[in-house]
Amino acid sequence: MYLCSMIDVEICCNSIASAVAAKDGCADRIELCRDLECGGLTPSEEDIAYCVHHLGLRTHVLIRPRPGNFCYTEAEQMEMIATIKRCKELGAKAVVLGFLTEEGKIDVEITRRMVQLASPMEVTFHRAFDEALQDPIEALWDVAASRCHRLLTSGQRPSALEGAEVIKSLIGVTGVEILAGAGVTPMNVRELVEKTGVREVHGSCKKSLDDGTFVTDAASVRQMIDKTLTL
């Protein structure tokens, strides 16, 4: 049975084990990826299908074919298009992506094309926004012009709490929902929400394993959700 929170909590999951832990912690929405150690890459089709159909989670799928910058070649874009189409077929709720131009600005043209291809799935523009060489409000308007439903951001700072002032300034400017993420934990989520006014938060609630990788911790997920119940 899921807990009912006025704050929509999204858990970043890098594997099936993490997705199971997120569900055990009463989450019902995840961002699914792999290789979180390098910032996250596109997960496998098998993992997407399992999370959607077996776990019954609202699954937002990261579309990122490689580590590094967010300026993609035509071949990489074609790969991303194929993945987006497959996510739609598999029943994903949303895809998560981001494109920058060679000048470091939001690539409105390519992003809008991907949003159109993804429909009726929602599209979240990810933290490529935080690397954009633009004023955050200007960049937000570009995200809006791309027709994205949501923006995942730390306010162009290393953590969402550090970027709280910028995050607050983004809310309500356009119709884009602001999802605060980066360094969000059960210990600081209340402070973040109170400082910014966001209604959506993103965290991994992860613990380190002996091999240097990470996995979602169900107890931390439950604590995160508990902390948001009275906000």
Regions found by a protein language model. Give the residues of each.
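N-terminal pre-domain/capping segments
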Residues: 6-30, 35-42
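Catalytic cores of alpha/beta
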Residues: 14-24, 68-86, 130-146, 167-180, ...
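Ordered, amphipathic secondary-structure segments that act as subunit-interaction surfaces
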Residues: 82-99, 103-106
